[in-house]
C-alpha cells in the first residue's frame, strides 16, 4: 500500500529510510513549537492556544505536502513572518492581532488562486534576484535582533540600545531588574548561543532543538539552586512545566477564527498583505528549489516536477493556519535535514506530520520553555538567513545599494515591510536615473510596487 501511494521503489527509497528521515526533520524544526508561542504572545495572543494552532498548522500543512505533491518537505508557521506579524504589524503599527490574522488569511486565499495558475512563479521571476537575497538577509538580522531583545541581551538606553549590565542598574519593562531574575537569564542566553553554535558546528541532528532544551535545563538547575528567582514584573516565570491539567490540549477558542475584516481596503492593509505575500512567496519557492536540487529532484530543465501541488499545499496551509490562529505557514528549510537522511517521498512528510500531531499532548513542556532559551534559536536561525548575502552582486552598485538599504532598514526601523518598501523604491529610482532600467528589463510589477510604496510614505 505504501509502495503504491508514495512510489518508494521509483524514488529509490524504503519505509525505514523514509520514517527515519521524517523523525530527523521533526527534530530539526520542533523548536517552532516553543518559539512561535513565545513570539506571538508578545502580540497579546494566548500562548497555549498559539501552541495548539502551531502544531495543527504544521500537521495539516505537512500532510497536504505528502498528499498533493508526494515530497519530503515539512511545513509550519515560518520564522521571520511570525516576527513581522507580532513586532511590526501589531506592536509597531498598532493593529490588533485579529487584523494581522486577516492579512494572513487573505494572503493564503490569494496564494491558492495564484498556485492553481502559473502566476506565483511569474511574480517570483519579476523581482530582481539580488533583491530577493537581500530580503532574506534583512530578515535574518531582524530575527537575530528580536532574539537578543527577548533575552534582554540588548535593552533600551541612552544610546537607543545598549548591552544589559550583569552587575549594574537596568530597567526591563520599566522595572529595575536584578541579577537573580533578568541578569542570570542574559548569562544563560549567551551560554545557549555558544552551546547551539557548538552543536551546529558538530552537525548534530536537531541542533537548534537540543540547544533550546539544554539552555532550558541549565535554567531549571539555576532555579533549584536559587540563582534564578521568578519575577513576573520583568517577564521571568517559573521554568518548571505545569502539569496541573495533565496532558490536556490547550484550547483554541481564544484565537480560533478571530478575523477582523474592518479596514481591509486601506493602503496599510495592502502593504501588510504584500509583505506577507512577498516573503512567503520567495521563502517557499526558494526552499523548494534549494532543498530539491540537493536531492536531485529537479528535472533536466532545472524545474521541480509537481511544484504546483507543493505550492498549493503551502497556500492551503497558510489559509487554514490563519483560521486556527497563527501566522503564515510555510515550507521549512529544515526539511533538508530529512532529505540528507534519504527522505525522497511524501512518507517522510507523513511521519513528520504524525509527530507534530502527537506533540499536542506535550504542551506543558513546550509552553514552559522561556524566551532566554528560545533566543539562541532566533539568533542562529538569523545566521542561516544571513548566508544569502553571498548571492548579492556587490560589484554592481546599482544592485548593491538597493540591497544594502533593504537589509539595514529592517533591523534599524524594526520592520520587515519598511525594508522591502525602501529596497524596491531605491532599486527602481537608481536604475531609472542611471539609465540602467532598460538594460536590466525591470518588470512592470516593480514599477507598480515602487509607486504604491511612494504613495504610502506620502499619505500615511
Regions found by a protein language model. Give the residues of each.
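Helix-loop-helix hairpins and the membrane-proximal interhelical loops
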Residues: 1-49, 167, 212-307, 451-455
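Helix-loop-helix junctions within the multi-pass membrane cores of secondary transporters/permeases
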Residues: 2-36, 57, 78-87, 91-139, ...
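Alpha-helical membrane-protein architecture signal
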Residues: 12, 16, 191, 270-274, ...
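Hydrophobic/aromatic residues within the transmembrane alpha-helices of Major Facilitator Superfamily
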Residues: 23-30, 63, 67, 144, ...
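Helix-coil boundary and interhelical linker segments in multi-pass alpha-helical membrane proteins
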Residues: 38-49, 88-99, 266-270, 368-370, ...
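Loop-to-helix transition at the N-terminal end of transmembrane alpha-helices
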Residues: 44-63
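Juxtamembrane transmembrane-helix boundary signature
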Residues: 58-79, 110
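Membrane-embedded alpha-helical modules
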Residues: 93-214, 350-460
Amino acid at each position: 500500500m505504501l509502495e503504491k501511494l508514495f512510489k518508494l521503489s521509483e524514488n529509490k527509497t524504503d519505509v525505514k529510510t523514509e520514517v527515519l528521515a521524517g523523525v530527523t526533520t521533526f527534530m530539526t524544526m520542533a523548536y517552532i513549537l516553543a518559539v512561535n508561542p513565545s513570539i506571538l504572545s508578545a502580540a497579546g495572543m494566548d500562548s497555549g492556544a498559539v501552541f495548539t494552532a502551531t502544531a495543527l498548522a504544521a500537521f495539516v500543512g505537512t500532510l497536504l505536502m505528502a498528499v498533493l505533491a508526494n515530497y519530503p518537505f515539512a511545513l509550519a508557521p515560518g520564522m521571520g513572518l511570525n516576527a513581522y506579524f507580532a513586532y511590526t504589524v501589531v506592536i509597531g503599527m498598532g493593529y490588533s492581532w485579529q487584523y494581522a490574522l486577516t492579512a494572513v488569511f487573505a494572503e493564503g486565499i490569494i496564494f491558492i488562486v495564484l498556485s492553481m495558475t502559473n502566476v506565483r512563479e511569474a511574480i517570483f521571476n519579476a523581482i530582481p534576484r539580488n533583491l530577493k537575497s537581500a530580503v532574506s538577509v534583512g530578515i535574518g538580522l531582524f530575527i537575530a535582533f528580536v532574539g537578543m531583545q527577548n533575552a534582554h541581551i540588548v535593552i533600551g538606553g541612552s544610546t537607543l540600545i545598549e548591552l544589559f549590565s550583569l552587575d549594574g542598574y537596568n530597567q526591563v519593562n520599566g522595572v529595575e531588574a536584578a541579577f537573580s531574575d533578568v541578569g542570570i537569564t542574559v548569562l544563560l542566553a549567551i551560554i545557549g548561543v555558544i552551546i547551539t553554535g557548538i552543536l551546529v558546528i558538530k552537525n548534530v541532528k536537531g541542533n537548534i532543538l537540543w540547544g533550546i532544551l539544554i539552555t532550558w535545563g541549565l535554567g531549571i538547575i539555576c532555579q533549584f539552586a536559587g540563582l534564578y528567582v521568578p519575577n513576573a514584573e520583568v517577564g521571568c516565570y517559573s521554568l518548571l512545566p505545569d502539569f496541573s491539567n495533565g496532558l490536556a490540549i490547550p484550547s483554541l477558542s481564544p484565537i480560533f477564527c478571530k478575523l477582523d475584516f474592518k479596514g481591509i481596503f486601506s493602503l496599510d492593509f495592502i502593504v501588510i498583505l504584500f509583505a506577507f505575500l512577498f516573503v512567503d512567496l520567495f521563502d517557499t519557492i526558494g526552499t523548494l528549489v534549494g532543498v530539491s536540487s540537493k536531492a536531485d529532484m529537479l528535472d533536466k530543465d532545472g524545474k521541480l516536477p509537481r511544484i504546483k501541488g507543493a505550492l498549493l499545499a503551502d497556500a492551503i496551509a497558510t489559509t487554514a493556519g490563519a483560521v486556527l490562529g497563527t501566522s503564515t505557514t510555510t515550507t521549512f528549510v529544515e526539511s533538508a535535514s530529512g532529505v540528507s537522511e534519504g527522505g525522497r517521498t511524501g512518507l517522510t512528510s507523513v511521519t513528520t506530520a504524525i509527530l507534530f500531531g502527537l506533540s499536542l499532548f506535550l504542551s506543558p513542556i513546550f509552553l514552559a520553555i522561556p524566551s532566554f532559551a528560545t533566543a539562541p534559536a532566533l539568533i542562529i536561525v538569523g545566521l542561516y538567513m544571513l548566508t544569502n548575502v553571498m548571492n548579492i552582486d556587490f560589484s554592481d552598485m546599482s544592485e548593491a545599494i538597493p540591497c544594502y538599504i533593504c537589509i539595514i532598514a529592517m533591523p534599524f526601523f524594526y520592520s520587515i515591510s519598511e525594508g522591502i518598501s525602501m529596497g524596491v523604491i531605491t532599486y527602481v529610482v537608481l536604475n531609472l536615473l542611471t539609465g540602467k532600467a532598460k538594460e536590466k528589463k525591470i518588470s512592470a510589477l516593480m514599477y507598480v510596487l515602487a509607486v504604491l510604496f511612494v504613495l504610502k510614505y506620502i499619505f500615511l
